[in-house]
Amino acid sequence: MPSLLITILLLNIVIYVINTIGAATIDSLLWLFYIKLPTGTSHMAREQRRLKREVIQLKREMNATSSQDEFAKWAKLRRRHDKALETYEAKNNELTQCKSSFDMTVKSVRWAATSGLMLFLQFWYSKRPIFTLPPGWIPWQVQWVLSFPRAPMGTVSIQIWGGACATVVALVGDAVGATMGFVSASKKEGMKVGAGVGEKEGKKSQ
């Protein structure tokens, strides 16, 4: 069943990418995108940012005003600051609650679309082989392991295929990451060497 074979492979790739980038990072990016949409939450976020700027501005004006020489002005600024701060804290708490609900929804959807879907497929297709091995190609003991837990003997089960995909994807991903890190480090080292040579030539010319 090629479609199931590819589906399991793609699911493992998606899960690896999510784990590599970090679920918290992805949640933060999705939240930033969400509050840019024309929704009530985006309006709330804009109002929260406006109130924050107002509180900071009033705080600066208070600090720049002497409470002794200009007490009336300072007291007025203090009242405005306290009122703005109270409004900001209320709006910020409301936005925090919205973000918590958003994060919970995103986590639920992400789990259902990745790990949850993987578990469902492994349960639903536990008796269906991913592909069949050539007869007599490997010992029956190995065939039993590859067909574990419920696939027919001489085939590869979805559980074994999923585990193999996860291992290969992790190895390839780690290898790509290590290669990119090595190339990046080599470029930085080359730039340092070039800069050092340029400084030496500059000193010689002087």
From Swiss-Prot:
Chief subcellular location equals endoplasmic reticulum
Q: State the coiled-coil residue ranges.
A: 42-99
Source organism's superkingdom? Eukaryota
Single biological process term from Gene Ontology: tail-anchored membrane protein insertion into ER membrane
Could you list this entry's UniProt keywords, alphabetically sorted. Answer: Coiled coil, Endoplasmic reticulum, Membrane, Transmembrane, Transmembrane helix, Transport
| Cytoplasmic compartment spans | 25-110, 173-206
Membrane topology, as annotated, equals: Multi-pass membrane protein
The compartments listed are:
Endoplasmic reticulum membrane
Keyword Coiled coil included in the entry's annotation: yes
Give one Pfam hit by family name. CHD5
A GO CC term attached to the entry: endoplasmic reticulum membrane
Return the InterPro entries for the record: Get1, Get1_fungi, Helix_hairpin_bin_sf
Membrane-crossing ranges are 5-24, 111-131, 156-172
What are this entry's molecular-function GO terms?
A: protein-membrane adaptor activity
Topological domains on the Lumenal side lie at 1-4, 132-155
Xref: PANTHER family: GUIDED ENTRY OF TAIL-ANCHORED PROTEINS FACTOR 1 (PTHR42650:SF1), TAIL-ANCHORED PROTEIN INSERTION RECEPTOR WRB (PTHR42650)
Q: Which family does it belong to?
A: Belongs to the WRB/GET1 family.
Q: What does this protein do?
A: Required for the post-translational delivery of tail-anchored (TA) proteins to the endoplasmic reticulum. Acts as a membrane receptor for soluble GET3, which recognizes and selectively binds the transmembrane domain of TA proteins in the cytosol.
Describe its partners and assembly state. Answer: Interacts with GET3.
Q: What is this protein called?
A: Protein GET1
Underlying gene: GET1
